[in-house]
Amino acid sequence: KRLQAAAETDMLTGVYNRAGMYQQLAEIEEHLKDRSEGLDIGLMFIDLDNFKHYNDTYGHDIGDLILKEMAAIFRDVSIGKGIVSRFGGDEFIMILETNDRKELEEIAKEIYARIEATSGFKKQIEKHLGHEIEVDESRLITCSMGISYAANVRNEDSVSELIKQADDLLYTVKTGEKGHYKFI
């Protein structure tokens, strides 16, 4: 049991890794076989903005700190609503049990508010480094999101389609003005 948990958990952030996310989806799909209705699902594909700058400038310890702080925010805003996974690198996916656009938008705004309240984790970074840093406003840690949603989702293929839609939206955001979200 502990080995399975270790194989499904991102050891740095404590959230599911990609394999863990797909395992959770397989378990949900198995559970849905006996139900007449599927689940309403919202999916947020999240990419950290300016992460590479901090990781390259201040080192991997600071990159790790940022990943942990972001994962904690995602975990906090999704408690009781869904799962969070580190999809790879500085990308995260939140799968939430709602297809209500307004609720999904409130969750996105809560994420941005929490990041903004930390000034892009400036104090945490300075504490870790042991000295102050100058951060240009355009270099603050933020995130960009692609958000997709659907009703009556019954299988992993449907979730894979939501991931693709959200990833495409995320790409659109990242090629424009970062630090925003876009809905399907």
What is the role of each PLM region?
Residues L3-Q23, I46-H60, K68:
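Conserved nucleotide-binding and Mg2+-coordinating catalytic segments in signaling enzymes
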Residues Q4-A5, R18-L39, A71-I79, E97:
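Short regulatory alpha-helical coupling segments
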Residues D56, E97, T175:
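Short, conserved catalytic or interaction motifs in soluble domains
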Residues A71-A72, E103-E134, D167:
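Alpha-helical scaffold within the catalytic cores of cyclic-nucleotide enzymes
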Residues I83-R86:
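A short pre-motif secondary-structure segment
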Residues I95-L104, Q124-S138, T142-L162:
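Catalytic strand-loop-helix junctions within cyclic-nucleotide turnover domains
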Residues N152, E161-I184:
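Catalytic/regulatory signature loops of cyclic-dinucleotide turnover enzymes
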